[in-house]
Amino acid sequence: MLHRAGDREEARNRLTALWHEIGPQGDAFHRCALAHYMADTQDDPRDELDWDLRALEAAEGFVTERPDNAAPGASSVADGPGPRHPLVALRAFFPSLHLNIAADYAALDRPADAHAQLRRARASINALADGAYRQGLRDAIDRLQLRIDGAAGRMA
């Protein structure tokens, strides 16, 4: 992706065009994934938080208002990329979404909100199958927890 190669502005421009194409009533899975990527292209932590919250809103809306013809979701998802039902794929986003939102709150010096999101990330990680992705998220949650707690300790 462009933003990982250092061209955040061009990535933002292209993702914004896609966002307008999908629209607010577009497919929740696509809105979630796109907003999740869009957050990573932001320079301002408040904007990053706004996009991460949009991604979470799309995911939560889809999970709670699942289409009648959707296949029942499995209790866990496969480790890594691969085809799966969008509901299951969206459930796999929750730990990462909550982790990103926690990081956004930490960047905005809102440790209580960050801690609340870390708790949600830990609670939602059980939807993932054991494997490298799940362990990587657990490690990232632990690192952010230590960083937030360390910052709070320096302020006391």
Q: For each predicted feature, which ranges?
A:
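Residue-level signature for tetratricopeptide repeat
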Residues: M1, M38-T41, L97, D104
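Alpha-helical segment of the N-proximal tetratricopeptide repeat
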Residues: M1-N13
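Structural motif corresponding to the intra-repeat A-B loop/turn of tetratricopeptide repeats
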Residues: A5, Q42-P45, L108
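Residues that mark the junctions of alpha-helical repeat units in TPR/alpha-solenoid scaffolds
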Residues: A11, P24-R31, E48, L87-L90, ...
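Flexible helix-coil transition and linker loops at the boundaries of alpha-helical arrays
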Residues: H20-G26, E60-L90, A127-G131
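TPR repeat positional signature
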Residues: R31-A35, H98, Q117
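"A position-specific structural signal for the A-helix of alpha-solenoid helical repeats
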Residues: L34-Y37, F93, N100, D139-R147
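TPR/TPR-like (Sel1-like) alpha-helical repeat modules
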Residues: D50-G61, D109-A129
